[in-house]
């Protein structure tokens, strides 16, 4: 396995897909990196030379914020929203949808599991 930005890249996948295993690199950013590094996107990771892997690693380190740094930045942005007390920060603090979705129904992912259903119990016969 090639190791780029602290992530083990799967050997059997094409490099254009495998590079997206890095947090912060999607399909379009991955293609940009490969274009700058002069690497064919259709080649498998196992077929890359050490020099090509080094070029990819260097471009990502130089031009992109990935993995731990990016996660930390996102967390700090959310914390800043909560500290200043804006609407988005309050929604984050309460664990509710932030981007205007409805909450009367269909907010289960953000709000967590539903409470116990309250219904009518059958009477036990004696």
From Swiss-Prot:
InterPro entries on file: Rbsml_uS13_C, Ribosomal_uS13, Ribosomal_uS13-like_H2TH, Ribosomal_uS13_bac-type, Ribosomal_uS13_CS
Entry-linked Pfam families: Ribosomal_S13
Gene3D superfamilies referenced in this protein's UniProt entry, alphabetically: 1.10.8.50, 30s ribosomal protein s13, domain 2 (4.10.910.10)
Source superkingdom: Bacteria
Alphabetized PROSITE patterns for the sequence: RIBOSOMAL_S13_1, RIBOSOMAL_S13_2
Any one annotated GO CC term: small ribosomal subunit
Name of the protein: Small ribosomal subunit protein uS13
Record organism: Chloroflexus aggregans (strain MD-66 / DSM 9485)
Lineage, broadest ranks: Bacteria, Bacillati, Chloroflexota, Chloroflexia, Chloroflexales
Gene: rpsM
